[in-house]
Amino acid sequence: MPSPVATVETDSLQQPILGSRRPSNYFWAIAVSVGGTGLLLAGLSSYLQVNLLPFSEPTRLAFLPQGLVMGLYGIAAILLASYLWFVISLDVGGGYNAFDRKTQKATIFRWGFPGKNRRVEITYPLSDIQAVRVDIKEGLNPKRALYLKVKGRGDVPLTRVGQPLPLTELESQGAELARFLAVPLEGL
C-alpha cells in the first residue's frame, strides 16, 4: 500500500499499515471454513446415516474410524477458521505511522489482541529520530523493512509483518520519510 506523498507545505505524514485484513488471510479463512464444514458434515453424515452433503455420499463411510476422524478434523478446522475470522475482525497488526512537524512527534500505532495492550501506541519526539534505515535481506526467506533509528531506543520497525514490500515501494517510502523528517537514509 503506497504511502501518502508529503510536500514541503504539509506538516504531517501518515502511512497506513495493513494488518491481518490482507487478501491472503481472507482466502485462508474462507478455504478453512468451507473445508472444515465439509469434513464435519461428512463425519456427522456417517454417524447419523443421513446425507448432509448434497454432492457426495458420506453415509457409505464407516463411522469408525473414517467418519470420526473426518468429524474431528472438521472441528479442528472450524476452530482454526474461527480464530482467523476473529483476528481479521480485530485487524491485529493494523495501524499507522504518523509524523507531525507541528507537534514535533512521531506516533507508531498498531492494533493488538483484546486485553490490556489492545492499543499499542508509541510516541517519540522528532528530535530523537536519527535516521531512517532500510533493511534488505534476499534469499529463501526475504526481509525488506524500514526502521526508525531513535536516540537511546534502538531501531523501531515501521513496515507491516508478512509479505515483503516490493523494492521500489520500500525505497520510495524510505526516501519520502527521510526527506520529510530531514534525516539520512541508511542501508541502500
Curated annotation (Swiss-Prot):
Alphabetized Pfam families for the sequence: Ycf4
Protein keywords: Membrane, Photosynthesis, Thylakoid, Transmembrane, Transmembrane helix
Top-level taxon in the UniProt lineage:
Bacteria
Identification of the protein by name: Photosystem I assembly protein Ycf4
Which function does this protein serve?
Answer: Seems to be required for the assembly of the photosystem I complex.
Q: Which HAMAP family match?
A: Ycf4
Alphabetical list of InterPro entries matching this protein: PSI_Ycf4_assembly (IPR003359)
Q: Which PANTHER family match?
A: PHOTOSYSTEM I ASSEMBLY PROTEIN YCF4, PTHR33288
Keyword Thylakoid on this protein? Answer: yes
One cellular component term (GO) for this entry is: plasma membrane-derived thylakoid membrane
- Biological process (GO), any one: photosynthesis
Q: Which residues cross the membrane?
A: 26-46, 68-88
Question: Which locations, inside or outside the cell, does it occupy?
Answer: Cellular thylakoid membrane
Kindly list any coiled-coil regions of this protein.
Answer: none
Query: Hey, which family's this protein in?
Result: Belongs to the Ycf4 family.
How does the protein's chain sit in the membrane according to the entry?
Multi-pass membrane protein
